[in-house]
Amino acid sequence: MQLCVALDLEKKEDNLSLLQELKGLDLWAKVGLRSFIRDGAVFLDEIRKIDENFKIFLDLKLYDIPYTMANAALECAKLDIDMLTVHLSSAKSALTALMQRLNALKKRPLIMGVSALTSFSEEEFLMVYNAPLKTQAIKLSAMGKESGIDGVVCSVFESLAIKEALGKDFLTLTPGIRLDQNDKEDQERVANAKEAKQNLSDFIVVGRPIYQAKEPREVVLELLKDC
């Protein structure tokens, strides 16, 4: 299991300062919409300057028509990133077009499809998708696998079921990781790192428990022990 550190702080300088504290550790730097829109592609180069071994996870959750998604993913791949997220709800035609475009490259990032955001409650998911969350997450994940993507973004609570249905080689990335399960904030389906490993998660995403800590490096070291 590998650790992705979410870089969601208010200022670019704060994100870079956090990474300076984590220099030398085996982790992924997760760049989401806020940081990428604000700081641009140059931010990725600044991450590499701190530690060239940091792997870069661009969490943009692409969702559009097939032509637009394929072109956007290609431009993201040109940034030499290691992982990119897309929405499974964009459907098989879009995912297939995207993978055909990326597979023509000598090197491409891992493509992870978002099944159900961890902010969804069961009731909210049912309202949007008119299906039980776990059932639909597996169905969307199966479509993603058929399209050729590498894995899915899901909660810890769907990870094991997806692995059992689609095979252990199909990757799962699980956000909503907390040190204390009572600390939900804006997430609904949260778990800790040990539970993520028990449910065969390949990647975990941790943000606030790290960057809100007095000693972020110590928190990361503890998390890495559980990985």
Swiss-Prot record:
Pfam families membership:
OMPdecase
EC assignment? 4.1.1.23
Matching InterPro entries, A to Z?
A: Aldolase_TIM, OMPdecase, OMPdecase_AS, OMPdecase_bac, OMPdeCOase_dom, RibuloseP-bd_barrel
Query: What is any one GO biological process for this UniProt entry?
Result: 'de novo' pyrimidine nucleobase biosynthetic process
Q: Which UniProt keywords apply?
A: Decarboxylase, Lyase, Pyrimidine biosynthesis
Catalyzed reactions: orotidine 5'-phosphate + H(+) = UMP + CO2
Write out the pathway annotation from the protein's UniProt entry.
Pyrimidine metabolism; UMP biosynthesis via de novo pathway; UMP from orotate: step 2/2
CDD domains recorded for this chain? OMP_decarboxylase_like
Lyase: present as a keyword of the record?
A: yes
One GO cellular component this record assigns the protein to is: cytosol
Keyword flag Lyase: yes
Return one GO MF term: orotidine-5'-phosphate decarboxylase activity
User: By its UniProt entry, which SMART domains does this protein fall under?
Assistant: OMPdecase
| Chain sites annotated for binding substrate | 8, 30, 59-68, 118, 178, 187, 207-208
Q: Which family does it belong to?
A: Belongs to the OMP decarboxylase family. Type 1 subfamily.
- Quaternary structure and partners: Homodimer.
Question: Its biological function?
Answer: Catalyzes the decarboxylation of orotidine 5'-monophosphate (OMP) to uridine 5'-monophosphate (UMP).
Name of protein = Orotidine 5'-phosphate decarboxylase
Name the gene for this chain. Answer: pyrF
